[in-house]
Every structure is written in C-alpha cells, then in structure tokens.
C-alpha cells in the first residue's frame, strides 16, 4: 500500500481568527459537518489540548466510528490530527494538517493536507472524498459566518 495525499488550498471568506477558533474547537467538529456526523463523544477529561481524543460517529456512506487525536498545533497557524485505532473510513494511518494564514482582514488562506493508506476502495475515490470534506468544512464555515453576521 502506498501513502496517498488529499490536498486543498483555497481562500475562505472568513477572518483568520474566526477560522482558527472554529477549527481549534476540536470537540465541535459536528458543527462544521452537520449532515455527515451523527454524533461526537468526548471523554470526561477532555481539555482541547494536544493528545485529546474525540469519538466521531458518521451516518452517511461510511457509517460507524472514527477515533481522532489532536496531535499538535501552533496557535492561529497550524493544527494536526490523526485517526487512531480502527475506523469505519477506508483508510489506515490517516494524518491531517491544516495551515492557515491571513490574506486580509476578511479572508483566510487554508492549506489542508491528509496523508493515508487507502484500503480496498478505489484510491482516487478516497482522495476525492477527503478533498470534498475539506472543502465542505470551508464552505460550511463561510455560510455559518455569513449567517451569524446577518443576524446582527
């Protein structure tokens, strides 16, 4: 099995501080993928720190549990997480990194990578699935930011 990579680089129409706050809320991933994630369970000792784990339950194509660990971050710049243990996803050894930088006060450049070994599924389909999800998170973040500001 070869390691594969999914990558998305795009400009997101939200301030960097907003993007970072939402991304770093490791326990709140369901708010960014509400139609994909059925539930997220957090251990009692969760502190949103490096090494913390979230249990994500999917309900669409890949139904089941994904256990993710927050591996590291540099405040307002970079975050890394990985899938640990068994997963309902068609991958092994998944590690993701997200880098962000401000382009101006209202826009953020996002560089999102996922590295993994694909299981039995079509490799290109798996790469595309992760790209789709990275883009969906960015799209949802833009929509939620716009919606929250239109209510003011």
Predicted segments with their positions:
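Short, well-ordered strand-loop elements centered on a beta-strand within folded domains, enriched
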Residues: 50, 80-83, 105-114
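Beta-strand elements of well-folded, non-transmembrane domains
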Residues: 12-14, 85-87, 100-102, 116-120
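Glycine-rich portal/gate segments that line the openings of hydrophobic small-molecule binding cavities
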Residues: 27, 31, 40-89, 136, ...
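Hydrophobic/aromatic beta-strand elements that line small-molecule binding cavities or substrate pockets
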Residues: 8-10, 66-72, 94-102
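Hydrophobic ligand-binding cavity/cleft-lining segments
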Residues: 1-46
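A conserved amphipathic terminal alpha-helix motif
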Residues: 109, 114-152
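A short, structured loop/turn motif at beta-sheet edges
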Residues: 16-17, 71-77, 99-109, 148
């Amino acid at each position: 099995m070869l390691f594969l990579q999914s990558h998305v680089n795009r400009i997101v129409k939200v301030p960097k501080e907003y993007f970072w706050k939402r991304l770093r809320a490791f326990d709140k991933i369901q708010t960014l993928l509400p139609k994909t994630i059925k539930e997220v369970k957090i251990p009692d000792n969760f502190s949103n720190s490096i090494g913390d784990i979230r249990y994500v339950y999917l309900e669409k194509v890949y139904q089941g549990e994904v256990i993710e660990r927050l591996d590291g971050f540099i405040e307002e710049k970079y975050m890394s997480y990985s899938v640990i243990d068994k997963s309902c996803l068609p991958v092994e050894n998944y590690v993701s990194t997200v880098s962000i930088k401000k382009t101006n006060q209202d826009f953020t450049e996002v560089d999102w990578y996922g590295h993994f070994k694909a299981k039995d599924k079509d490799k290109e389909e798996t790469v595309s699935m992760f790209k789709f999800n990275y883009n969906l998170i960015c799209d949802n973040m833009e929509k939620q930011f716009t919606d929250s500001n239109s209510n003011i």
